[in-house]
Amino acid sequence: MKTIDVKILDPRMQEQMPAYATSGSAGLDLRACIEAPITIKPGETHLIPTGLAIHIGNPAYAAVILPRSGMGHKHGIVLGNLVGLIDSDYQGQLMVSTWNRGQAEFVLNPMERLAQLVIVPVLQVGFNIVDDFDSSERGAGGFGSTGKH
């Protein structure tokens, strides 16, 4: 298993380190490291600290912060930036941009699981400037061009 460096910024995280829930889990839960409950009104966004900083250190990897499916489906709580991208050379605290897209207020409690962190491979590429592309089956067809069903 690949390891990355983590710095615990909030002592409460000593007992709440992210862990894979099952052997098939892709994401590690991130928690809201807040001192008191926060009420997030419909349409509001809040930047929530996680109490952790990571340093991946290897440009062949990055991390993405994704919403937890239950939070979005049941409560309308999703990420304000939709997906958070953490570059391999970032060393600051992981923060979760939290947006209430629902119709009701949501109370976020201290240490509540809020989002998930997924480590992904990255391929850095260069560009080869061309005048034209070799033809492909799809061509330049965009949104909806491959059919409805």
UniProtKB/Swiss-Prot annotation:
Enzyme Commission no: 3.6.1.23
Pathway field: Pyrimidine metabolism; dUMP biosynthesis; dUMP from dCTP (dUTP route): step 2/2
Domain of life of the native organism: Bacteria
Keywords assigned: Hydrolase, Magnesium, Metal-binding, Nucleotide metabolism
Pfam families: dUTPase
InterPro entries membership: dUTPase, dUTPase-like, dUTPase-like_sf, dUTPase_trimeric
The protein's role, per its UniProt record: This enzyme is involved in nucleotide metabolism: it produces dUMP, the immediate precursor of thymidine nucleotides and it decreases the intracellular concentration of dUTP so that uracil cannot be incorporated into DNA.
Name the record gives this protein: Deoxyuridine 5'-triphosphate nucleotidohydrolase
Gene that produces this protein: dut
